[in-house]
Amino acid sequence: MVAPSRYNRDVDSDIPRLQPASTGRGSSMRVDLVTVPYRYDERGEGLGAGPDALLAAGLPEQLRAAGVELTGPHEARLNPSLQEEGRTALNIGRLGADTARLVAAARRIGDGALVLAGDDTAAIGVVSGLKQAAVEGAAIGVVWVDAHGDFNTPETSFSGILAGMPVAILAGLAGPLWREAAGLATPVETEHIVLAGTRELDEKEEKLIRSTDVQIVPATELCDGDDFAQAIDRLTRRCAQLYLHVDLDVLDPRFVPSASTPSANGLSIDELVTTMTAVLQTGKVAAVAISSLNPGAGARGERSVTSAMKAIAGALPAWIATPGPC
């Protein structure tokens, strides 16, 4: 059960309310709300508290008030009997298998899955679920909106941080046991991956990315020029479904002052909304994930929660109003 909100909605009254939108398929759209309240394999710790903070701030009520037919929230869980001490990546994969189960169920009964994730490692389970529910052979594209590339492997990473590896794992360049545990049988083609809002890459990581077909649209070019629009158009033509992943550290630290991996010169909330909307309007988005919200640190955490709510409220009408993928 989610505790009463400590995020004052009167104080945060400038959070835009989602507006009802006609989908052409009836009065509402089905969205399954999935939460993955974990940092790695630890429930509710640090970033793992982010999903519950969004629930407490009233996100489900806001969605329903906008006419969204919302099921859930359904929480992905790591069975304690399957958790092995010292095998974090394998544990994350097993958690991902439950995330995949929930996402696949959402795709089979509704239009899309909105995933509130603790950290970026949840993405492997989300994509696994999309692939399990999709027609065999259907291409799935990934739009990764993040200050960081998250394209490290154990060989390229300076830190060994697992949260810096999810995109490389999705692409099949690392983590085979992790992918297998999550049920992701086939990797995502690198030509079907767009990194957007990127502004911090490790040297070896960038070299690895440049050796692939992954397209990078840096933060400095995201809202200027046609690069992002062209990248999304190309992805839409090549893929049956898209997965939109948003790491909130793509925002400038003044909007997410509690971010665990802050990166200067980030996006404004309006720029993030514009970026998300461009993807959501394609009609190909099957799942959206919001990750890396740190609600701790007192007033700084509260401001970060408010920023996340603003971004979701600003962008989601484009998803509601656009027919989704089959």
How should each PLM-predicted stretch be described?
Residues 1-26:
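N-terminal amphipathic/basic-hydrophobic helices that include classical n-h-c signal peptides
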Residues 18, 24-114, 125-126, 133-135, ...:
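Catalytic cores of soluble, metal-dependent hydrolases
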Residues 24-26, 134-137, 159-160, 184-188, ...:
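Solvent-exposed alpha-helices and their adjacent loops that cap or buttress functional pockets
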Residues 34, 118-119, 145-147, 196, ...:
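Active-site flanking residues adjacent to catalytic metal/cofactor-binding acidic residues
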Residues 112-180, 282-286:
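Active-site histidine-anchored catalytic micro-motif
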Residues 149, 200, 248-252:
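Short, glycine/acidic-enriched loop or turn micro-motifs at the edges of active sites
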Residues 152, 201-203, 295-297:
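Active-site environment of divalent metal-dependent phosphoester hydrolases
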Residues 160-190, 194-203, 216, 223-226:
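Active-site glycine-rich loop that binds ribose-phosphate moieties when present
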